């Protein structure tokens, strides 16, 4: 039918990482805890394996009465954005070999000294630092993909006005998530209405303050509906008024620094299982 058109497409991406990350053998002897509570091991030189990100999609356009007055259009498919490789670079730069630090709770251990070399090590052995942050990535991590569907109708009205109603829904296929693999199980809960979890300690491995780990989730979503009236003119100008409302929820708003993303994520319970919350991209009206 001339007034009904379908389109289909298939895209695929294969992110690949060279074997450039440094190995810290000491980390391989440590046990960590993933977001499901299971004990796991990591290697600092193990980056995500290459995997195919399939992105099929279909679309349609239907001129209902074949007179360009009433048009239904829409489509559905999986979409892959441009990979943000900085997420992976966190692991390359935070492995306990390149840099290290000392976190002291007792300020009398190293009192203030204006000399910047006062506490600088006299020798650097090349072995892991006495204390170091880790940024890790789950071996089966996949870059973000969303399944997005939209439907819309355009209707020509008297006086040359075009009315449009549209709805878009997106859900995570491979959404981003972070958890601290060095955070132990909560030991108790508060009493009363505020029954949040409590921790008696914040490290499984004492020399690793945090091991923020990049992983995936598939619970985030967003939707938006809009309605507009538009009056185009022959000289190329147009007048348009529109209203839209939407909602966006995810488990974390990813940033370029793994630790900062995990620490700055507002939660009310277990920080390794934050649950859905409004995204910073939540547009509302």
Regions found by a protein language model. Give the residues of each.
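Active/binding-pocket-proximal capping segment
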Residues: 10-14, 24-29, 245, 258
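Exposed boundary/loop context
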Residues: 2, 70, 119, 268-270, ...
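Residues on the lipid-exposed face of transmembrane beta-strands in outer-membrane beta-barrel proteins
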Residues: 1-2, 10, 58-62, 151-155, ...
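Short Gly/Thr/Asp-enriched flexible loops that form oxyanion-binding sites at enzyme active sites
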Residues: 18
